[in-house]
UniProtKB/Swiss-Prot annotation:
Complex and partners: Forms a HipA(2)HipB(2) heterotetramer which can interact with a single operator on DNA. When 2 operators are present each HipB dimer contacts 1 HipA molecule, which are brought together by the DNA bend and dimerize, blocking the HipA active site and inactivating its toxic activity. Mutations present in allele hipA7 (G22S and D291A) decrease the affinity of HipA for HipB.
Phosphoserine modified-residue sites: 150
Organism name: Escherichia coli (strain K12)
Effect of residue 309 to Q: Loss of autophosphorylation; cells grow normally; protein can accumulate to high levels in E.coli
Protein name as catalogued: Serine/threonine-protein kinase toxin HipA
Length: 440
């Protein structure tokens, strides 16, 4: 039976096996179980001897891959993979995945921990960033057969290595340092066309605003190559060693992986985890008080900026030695406000991915949410009322200045319509806070 050897930073963790019937099983290596660095590959796959055969195995590895069937088909075509199944796709592109996971076919020799890369010219960078237009997945152009990465999510993206001021393609199993996100473009729905051609600017703005308001988010920059405009987001699951000679991968997983769920239920409305389940899980965090506070603070931020995609795959935890865990920075933040009107959608259509508690059921419609719904949710969760008041009060006080500070920091060619759309709607919702908490 074919096997993929699973590594974490030069340590052999175990083996993923695909059975004759297509089922996926995983077994931890004895040396990993005995290691002082030992930790579970996923919190849904506890350290144990023997084969793990639960659905969590398939779901964990499947969640390392792009969500889009179209992108998966491109991977099959590009590398002649046997199928869309996680084992077959990761056999081809599992060298650099989300978190610390590296997957290598058992018959391949691996040399650790050599760092190797190829510097990209601007023309080559543009070729990588536009590869998806030629049905090439994740920027893995044909001339770079050694460049094999897996980046989860629904958006067109790739990952690159930054060395000094140069963008580089990593060689072998050298890690990447940045996720590179391309414009989403138009999304056609039955009753609307969502123009997300400025998604790069949108996300950059939202990340700046989040940071200005004290939220833990990754650094990002807008990069250009030829006619391409992309967002380079620094990976928080990577860290240089003290000598800056080796780039380490940091173990992490998203909430679908944590709970052993498939990506098809990442939304609460589809049966996925909501605020209550995640807040209960964060009670076990090594930084429980901080993580629960930050998570609730981020829920308010998502409401204020009209972020409708805060599903389970957009929240993650670092997995530490022994299996302890803590919340990662927040990521994949984009506002729906710029797509309102015209051929887009109406404000009444915007809904949070995770509902808040109301007098009757759950409240998700952004334009129908008020501070009282966060307080009601906090009460149900036994999150201290005084802390929820503090979060709401801080946003009431900080929003106006934060918006001004972000605006003055934007590049001169930044699209004004993105700023206007987000800012005007944030201020409108902020009014609901300032009426109760003041804005001084």
């Amino acid at each position: 039976m074919p096997k993929l050897v699973t590594w974490m930073n030069n340590q052999r963790v175990g083996e993923l096996t695909k059975l004759a019937n297509g089922a996926h099983t995983f077994k931890y290596a004895p040396e990993w179980l005995a290691s002082r660095y030992a930790r579970p590959l996923s919190l849904s796959l506890p350290l144990q001897r023997g084969n793990i055969t639960s659905d969590a195995v398939f779901n964990f590895f499947d969640n390392l891959l792009p969500d889009s069937p179209i992108v998966r088909d491109r991977i099959v075509k590009r590398y002649h993979a046997k199928s869309r199944q996680p084992f077959d796709l990761l056999s081809e592109i599992g060298r650099d995945s989300v978190g610390a996971v590296t997957l290598i076919p058992e018959d391949e020799t691996v040399t650790h921990p050599i760092m190797a890369w190829e510097k990209l010219t601007e023309a080559r960078l543009e070729e990588v960033l536009t590869a998806y237009k030629a049905d090439i997945p994740l920027g893995m152009i044909r001339e770079e057969n050694d460049f094999r990465i897996s980046v989860a999510g629904a958006q067109e993206k790739t990952a690159l290595l930054r060395i000094g001021n140069d963008w580089c393609i990593p060689k072998g199993i050298t890690p990447t340092t940045h996720i590179i996100k391309l414009p989403i473009g138009e999304i056609r729905q039955p009753n609307a066309t969502l123009d997300l051609s400025q998604s790069v600017d949108n996300e950059y703005y939202c990340l700046l605003l989040a940071k200005e308001l004290g939220l833990n988010v990754p650094d990002a920059e807008i990069i250009k190559a030829g006619n391409v405009r992309a967002l380079a987001v620094e990976r928080f699951d990577r860290r240089w060693n003290a000598e800056r000679t080796v780039l380490l991968r940091l173990p992490q997983e998203d909430m679908c992986q944590t709970f052993g769920l498939p990506s098809s239920v990442k939304y609460e409305s589809d049966g996925g985890p909501g605020i209550a389940r995640i807040m209960a899980f964060l009670m076990g965090s090594s930084e429980a008080l901080k993580d629960r506070y930050d998570f609730m603070k981020f829920q308010v931020f998502q409401w204020l900026i009209g972020a409708t995609d805060g599903h389970a795959k957009n929240f993650s935890v670092f997995i530490q030695a022994g299996g302890s865990y803590r919340l990662t920075p927040f990521y994949d933040i984009i506002s729906a406000f710029p797509v309102l009107g015209g051929t887009g959608i109406h404000i009444s259509d915007l809904k949070l991915a995770m509902g808040l508690n109301a007098s009757k059921g759950k409240k998700t419609a952004i334009d129908k949410i008020y501070p009282r719904h966060f307080l009601a949710t906090a009460k149900v969760l036994r999150f201290p009322e005084v802390q929820m008041h503090e979060i709401l009060s801080d946003f009431a006080r900080m929003i106006p200045a934060a918006l001004d500070n972000v605006k003055t920091s934007l590049p001169t060619d930044f699209p004004e319509n993105v700023v206007t759309a987000v800012e005007s709607n944030v201020l409108r919702l902020h009014g609901r806070l300032s009426r109760e908490y003041g804005s001084k």
